[in-house]
UniProtKB/Swiss-Prot annotation:
Pfam family, one: AIRS
Organism annotation: Methylococcus capsulatus (strain ATCC 33009 / NCIMB 11132 / Bath)
PANTHER family registered for this protein in UniProt: TRIFUNCTIONAL PURINE BIOSYNTHETIC PROTEIN ADENOSINE-3 (PTHR10520:SF12), TRIFUNCTIONAL PURINE BIOSYNTHETIC PROTEIN ADENOSINE-3-RELATED (PTHR10520)
EC number from the UniProt entry: 6.3.3.1
Localisation: Cytoplasm
Protein name as annotated: Phosphoribosylformylglycinamidine cyclo-ligase
Main localization of the protein described in the UniProt heading: cytoplasm
Catalytic activity as recorded in UniProt: 2-formamido-N(1)-(5-O-phospho-beta-D-ribosyl)acetamidine + ATP = 5-amino-1-(5-phospho-beta-D-ribosyl)imidazole + ADP + phosphate + H(+)
Gene3D superfamilies attached to this UniProt entry: PurM-like C-terminal domain (3.90.650.10), PurM-like, N-terminal domain (3.30.1330.10)
GO CC, alphabetical: cytosol
Biological or metabolic pathway of the protein: Purine metabolism; IMP biosynthesis via de novo pathway; 5-amino-1-(5-phospho-D-ribosyl)imidazole from N(2)-formyl-N(1)-(5-phospho-D-ribosyl)glycinamide: step 2/2
Organism classification: Bacteria, Pseudomonadati, Pseudomonadota, Gammaproteobacteria, Methylococcales
InterPro entries in the record: PurM-like_C_dom, PurM-like_C_sf, PurM-like_N, PurM-like_N_sf, PurM_cligase
């Protein structure tokens, strides 16, 4: 005897809501439109994103691409329900990486993955991404929202970003001009940025304090969820008037690991840790986590989010220019002879 199967499955019953995805696209279109810049040839929703290179402004244009994420800072955002800032973080991590080679960010794409799509949460994140793109001067031209039931628990989500920029071939900053005697200038960070959060979360958990606990006049959560500073516009403006020998984005690994990445063979860096005041959040983390000072500088930015290397004769005007552009800049050290490494004094 033949029996009829009473079940009738569809994609939504399997955990993927196409209608919710479409609703999200409509929600984020106004935010994406605010980021449009010359070169954008199509809006969101196509199979691919189109961008016309500004070849009239370059003799030999070179594309520079970067990709990154926000790491476990997302866990704090999810637990606190504060999602917009991590969108800014995502753009910052990618755009700051490519500007260190002298590149002007052109466009950005994002990847948002979750187990069950919450349109409000995703829209908040992507609104933050659009805000970050405005700060970096790049266009949000597309992205992917992946709803993957069974892959992520509850309201968890993950982010990845992709940024493409352009630089004149002769103007690429690769560290090759760095010489002993060059000066190092630090740009203040806004906090831990988007690195070291696995250790941060461990310390916070050990402390037994909630994100609303006061730390130096601010809630702990406000310190930890402060968006990563985007240095793109002031640095691009600086490059118009100063020959920058190297730039180092101080991310995971701190100054200890990141500064040597831009130093040529035969050079090292001497950093004066008394040249700036370490923000209170880092002192709090060191105190509550019992973190040794070398480990602090190898894990966190410790208040310095970007380092600029210039010739000695350009130090004063670089500091003046960065200050006039709204950055807190301070002389932090110099280049010395030696193998690529950081020596703290």
């Amino acid at each position: 005897m033949k029996t009829e199967n009473p079940l009738s499955f569809d994609y939504k019953s399997a955990g993927v809501d196409i209608a919710a995805g479409n609703a999200l696209v409509e929600r984020i279109k106004p935010a994406a439109r605010k980021t449009v810049r010359p070169g954008v040839l199509a809006g969101l929703g196509g199979f691919g994103s189109l961008f016309e290179l500004p070849v009239d402004r370059y003799r030999k244009p070179v594309l520079v691409a970067g990709t990154d994420g926000v790491g476990t800072k997302l866990r704090l955002a999810i637990e606190s329900g504060r999602h917009g800032g991590v969108g800014i973080d995502l753009v910052a991590m990618c755009a700051n990486d490519i500007v260190v080679q002298g590149a002007e960010p052109l466009f950005f794409l994002d990847y948002y993955a979750t187990g069950k799509l919450d349109v409000d949460v995703a829209a908040s994140v992507i609104a933050g991404i659009a805000q970050g793109c405005e700060r970096a001067g790049c266009a949000l031209v597309g992205g992917e929202t992946a709803e993957m039931p069974g892959m992520y628990a509850g309201g968890d989500y993950d982010l990845a970003g992709f940024c493409v920029g352009v630089v004149e071939k002769e103007a690429i900053i690769d560290g090759s001009r760095v010489r002993p005697g060059d000066r190092l200038i630090g740009l203040a960070s806004s906090g831990p940025h988007s690195n070291g959060y696995s250790l941060i979360r461990k310390i916070v958990g050990h402390s037994g304090l909630g994100l609303d606990a006061p730390v130096a006049g601010r809630a702990l959560g406000d310190w930890l969820l402060e968006p990563t500073r985007i240095y793109v516009k002031p640095l691009l403006e600086l490059l118009k008037s100063v020959e920058v020998h190297a730039l180092a984005h101080i991310t995971g690994g701190g100054i200890t690991e990141n500064l040597p990445r831009v130093l040529p063979v035969g050079t090292a860096a001497r950093i004066d840790t008394a040249a700036w005041t370490m923000p209170e959040i880092f002192r709090w983390l060191q105190r509550h986590g019992g973190v040794e000072t070398p480990e602090m500088f190898r894990t966190f930015n410790c208040g310095v989010g970007m380092i600029v290397c210039v010739a000695p004769e350009d130090e004063a005007r670089t500091l003046e220019a960065l200050s006039s552009l709204g950055e807190r800049a301070f002389a932090v050290g110099e280049i010395i002879a030696g193998e690529p490494a950081v020596h703290y004094v």
